[in-house]
Amino acid sequence: MGFVDANTISKMSRLRCGVPDHFSLNKSHELHLHIPTFSSHYTFYPGHPKWPRTKRRLTYSFQPGTRTDVINPILHATQMWASVSHFTFTQARSHNRANIKISFQFGDHGDGFPFDGPGGTLAHAFPPSDGRLHFDGDETWVDGVLPGAIDMQTVGLHELGHILGLGHSPDYNSIMSPFFGSGQRKFLGQDDIDGIRALYQS
């Protein structure tokens, strides 16, 4: 029989990504799980979906009417992923033709993963090559660190990892950890870099 300890309750009450945590472990993780110092924690979606070799130049777009102050944080997030991979990201003029479609949604918005209002689930994204990235429009989004608010760049960086094919990492220092704190900014960690390079063998 399982039990809920203080640590579990703390995690359950944290802000988090809405993507489920059931991912397949990478081979390196399976081989080195017994050696924590050298283990990797990155995971992939079942079947390891990824963008085809012909799609290394990805376009992204915001749903028309999206507030302009979220554009730069997402730009910076794409630049971070580009700096450690073979991907490039360009903002598209047409939302419908973009590889990555970014939007703010509220409550039940028709994709099977309803948002829950302020707190709780912050955002979710779909694996390659779906390209949908949804932020919960009920959250307080900012560019930077502000108590009680959510950093758009941090969550965008995480969700773009899902868009590229990475799952959640149990390493809280990884950008792919499913948990976030308000008033917090995170960056790519070595585990994230190792994961994207392993998935695309670069």
Residues covered by each model-derived region:
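Zinc-dependent metalloendopeptidases
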Residues: 1-202
